[in-house]
Amino acid sequence: MLAVSIKNLSHKINNKSILNNVNFELKKDSIACILGPSGSGKTTLLKLIAGLDKVQNGHILINDQEVSSAKKHLPTEKRKIGFLFQDYALFPHLTVKENLKYPINFKNSIYKIEDIIDVVK
């Protein structure tokens, strides 16, 4: 099981502060629920924990290993982290891969679909 530690995490998107000095710890074998209004940074926080976005300020540790500096060992650890959104929309006429690619087609994304599929495998 994993332990997750967030220390002094701050994150901006387009110069807008999304997360400001967030601190918390999840002990091994724990379950957490992140609640908040739309735009409060829930998805941003989850993307940072999953390594889908780069940490700008602060630290995210999984089993005492820094997420941003542990590219080689964390993929197996990150596979043990899951998150479920309250609302989701899948297009039934698309494959799983096409559903994953859909939002990337409309954004200037730095991510490649193959990288995302590797993370979710």
Where are these regions (language model features)?
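Short beta-strand immediately N-terminal to the Walker A/P-loop
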Residues: 32-33, 83
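The feature captures the beta-strand-to-loop junction immediately N-terminal to the Walker
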Residues: 35-37
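Helix-to-loop junction immediately C-terminal to a conserved catalytic motif
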Residues: 50
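Conserved ABC transporter NBD signature motif
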Residues: 58-69
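Conserved ABC ATPase "signature" region
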Residues: 65, 108-121
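ABC ATPase NBD coupling module
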Residues: 67-82
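ABC-type ATPase nucleotide-binding domains, specifically the catalytic core motifs of the NBD
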Residues: 94-113
